[in-house]
């Protein structure tokens, strides 16, 4: 029977001819599989088929395959994250100062909306003034922040010709509507209970004033020229502890000059004064403020030969102290400003001038 060469080639494809010996020592050829060859006991070659237990049980063993899960790409990340998350940027603004907030608002309309939020500026104002609480205000907090940190002081609006220099002391809170003013920080504070303001000053060098506008107050220390003469050759100076309600500079009555300072009392010490002092306390928190270290002069007034003005501020009080050279005495004046004729007191000044 004839077969085609292709069929014959298919039958022997994958096989090899291996020589084996017969019983007479001759050789004969045997076809065996080329993929697995081993010798039997007679020295002949035979095929060994290896199967797994799963194959024997009819199971198909799956091979190793590549990962087919979707891979993340850069566009995928960008599509899932939005740079314009209001909560994130509102939180970021808590760490920005006023200038940085203005720059952020100038970026585009979306950031402008975030940066102009009143709560953002309220937080920035309380943080930078270092006061723990706030009170109801009539102005926006961005305007309040600007008036507090734009370098303005009370003598920038009025009496510019008398002004020499100034120093920002900080901010504190007056919330009891009654303040205790004193020019003496030595010894224990004594609160007068009777008499007019002038009588209180003459007897103890301190007084009580009522109808204080509650809220945050800003304190500055001002250095002025002699108020008694207009001579350019006069070297006399006057020190003033100048405190104001945080919204004073935004009030129309102050800006147009209709609100003015009134002298409420004065006290003259006609002997050598070692220092010029002035302090303002919230009466309700007087005991707490006294124990905060204000009366411990050694802790904040410097060395005995240090004549530079020193100041200390507490949550509900402020005080200044300047050592003086030998002198003939000192004149202390107390001024207040009201918000209109019958309004609350919105500013207080304690001034010291050598006689």
UniProtKB/Swiss-Prot annotation:
Superkingdom field: Eukaryota
Organism: Arabidopsis thaliana
Disordered: region residues: 1-44
Domain F-box: 78-124
SUPFAM superfamilies: F-box domain (SSF81383)
Database matches in InterPro entries: F-box-like_dom_sf
Entry protein name: Probable F-box protein At5g36000
Bias type Basic and acidic residues, positions: 1-14
């Amino acid at each position: 029977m004839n077969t085609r060469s292709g069929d014959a080639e298919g039958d022997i494809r994958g096989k090899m001819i291996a020589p084996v010996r017969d019983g007479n020592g001759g050789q004969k050829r045997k076809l065996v599989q080329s993929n697995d060859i081993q010798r039997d006991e007679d020295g002949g070659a035979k095929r060994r088929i290896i199967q797994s237990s799963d194959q024997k049980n009819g199971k198909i063993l799956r091979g190793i395959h590549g990962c087919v899960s979707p891979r993340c790409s850069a566009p995928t990340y960008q599509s899932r994250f939005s740079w314009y998350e209001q909560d994130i940027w509102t939180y970021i603004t808590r760490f920005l100062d006023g200038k940085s907030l203005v720059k952020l608002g100038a970026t585009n309309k979306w950031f402008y909306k975030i940066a102009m939020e009143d709560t953002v500026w309220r937080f920035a104002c309380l943080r930078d003034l270092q006061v723990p609480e706030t009170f109801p205000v009539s102005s926006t907090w961005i305007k309040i922040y600007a008036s507090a940190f734009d370098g303005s002081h009370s003598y920038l609006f009025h009496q510019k010709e008398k002004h020499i220099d100034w120093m920002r002391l900080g901010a504190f809170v007056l919330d009891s509507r009654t303040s205790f003013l004193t020019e003496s920080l030595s010894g224990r504070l004594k609160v007068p209970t009777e008499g007019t303001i002038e009588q209180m000053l003459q007897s103890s060098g301190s007084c009580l004033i009522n109808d204080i506008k509650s809220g945050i107050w800003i304190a500055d220390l001002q250095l002025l020229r002699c108020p008694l003469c207009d001579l350019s050759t006069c070297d006399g100076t006057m020190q003033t502890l100048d405190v104001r309600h945080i919204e004073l500079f935004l009030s129309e009555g102050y800006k147009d000059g209709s609100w003015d300072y009134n002298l409420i009392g004065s006290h003259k010490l006609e002997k050598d004064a070692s220092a010029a002092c002035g302090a303002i306390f919230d009466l309700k928190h007087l005991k707490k403020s006294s124990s905060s270290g204000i009366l411990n002069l050694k802790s904040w007034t410097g060395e005995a030969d240090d004549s530079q003005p020193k100041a200390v501020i507490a949550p509900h009080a402020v005080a200044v102290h300047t050592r003086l050279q030998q002198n003939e005495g000192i004149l202390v004046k107390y001024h207040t400003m009201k918000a209109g004729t019958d309004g609350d007191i919105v500013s207080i000044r304690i001034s010291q001038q050598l006689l």
